[in-house]
């Protein structure tokens, strides 16, 4: 018996929802404690000073300050938060 498969439109046409990964706060940008700096899968960026890492590898600020990125000799990129020192009144 001759069978002909359908055009394919009913079998295709699905896609996963985007995960909105990437850098949320860039170098020099001010952050508050708890602000998400980077959403990532795995450790493309590593936590530096005043930065914590969640169980899904999200990097977040532990302290208010300015975000900075630094590449170390081991080839890893570290994200740090430099606290903004306010003048004593």
Swiss-Prot record:
GO terms for molecular function: structural constituent of ribosome. It comes from the Bacteria. This is Large ribosomal subunit protein bL27. One of its GO terms (biological process) is translation. Gene3D superfamilies: 2.40.50.100. Residues 1-21 are annotated as: Disordered. PROSITE patterns: RIBOSOMAL_L27 (PS00831). Belongs to the bacterial ribosomal protein bL27 family. One of its GO terms (cellular component) is cytosolic large ribosomal subunit. Keywords: Ribonucleoprotein, Ribosomal protein.
């Amino acid at each position: 018996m001759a069978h002909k498969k359908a055009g394919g439109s009913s079998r295709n046409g699905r896609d996963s929802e985007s995960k909105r990964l990437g850098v949320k706060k860039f170098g020099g940008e001010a952050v508050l404690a708890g602000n998400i700096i980077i959403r990532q899968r795995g450790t493309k960026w590593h936590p530096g000073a005043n930065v914590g890492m969640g169980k899904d590898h999200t990097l977040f600020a532990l302290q208010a300050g300015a975000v900075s990125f630094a590449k170390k000799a081991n080839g890893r990129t570290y994200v740090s938060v430099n606290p903004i020192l306010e003048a004593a009144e």
